[in-house]
């Protein structure tokens, strides 16, 4: 009997380190990886680039596309997949949980000042630092009934990755 796919969704506000952490997890598990930003429509990217926060209606097609990608990985028999997605609200996470398989959230949560400094240092990303406050305002923490962990990642990427991988393996995932 085959095991169901476990989808790790590395989540959090813009600039929190999702991509770096997800790539470390993907490398450790040698699993398929999807950068959530790649699933946004050009209209969404333009809107965010102009400093205009996305509405729920803007996000729903994006979330459904990510969910469908996750289900495709299950259909291929993958043991694990890794996805980056802000997943700011529970209702957004509910859409992702509709994917075939088990969905586990890894919420990266640096302090505001650390996150802002990281965003200011980024070059060439469509998401501007001004968007951080709007995302923080709507962020809903993981509920006690949601599979996942919150990592306060104020440290260096290697420290955050080590904490994340230790938690994932402590849950019984991985080799």
Where are these regions (language model features)?
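Conserved substrate/cofactor phosphate-moiety recognition/catalytic segment
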Residues: 23-68
């Amino acid at each position: 009997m085959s095991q169901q796919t476990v989808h790790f969704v590395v989540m959090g506000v813009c600039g929190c380190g999702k991509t770096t952490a997800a790539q470390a997890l993907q490398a450790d598990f040698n699993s398929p990886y999807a950068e959530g930003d790649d699933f946004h429509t050009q209209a969404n990217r333009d809107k965010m680039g102009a400093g205009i926060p996305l509405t729920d209606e803007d996000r729903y097609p994006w979330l459904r596309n990510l969910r469908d990608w996750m289900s495709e990985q299950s259909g291929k028999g993958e043991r694990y997949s890794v996805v980056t997605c802000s997943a700011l609200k529970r209702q957004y996470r509910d859409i992702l949980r509709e994917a075939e398989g088990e969905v586990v959230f890894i919420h990266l949560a640096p302090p505001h000042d650390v996150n802002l400094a990281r965003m200011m240092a980024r070059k060439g990303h469509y998401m501007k630092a001004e968007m951080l406050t709007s995302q923080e305002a709507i962020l809903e923490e993981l509920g006690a009934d949601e599979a996942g962990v919150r990592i306060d990642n104020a440290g260096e990427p290697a420290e955050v990755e080590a904490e994340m991988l230790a938690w994932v393996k402590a849950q019984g995932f991985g080799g």
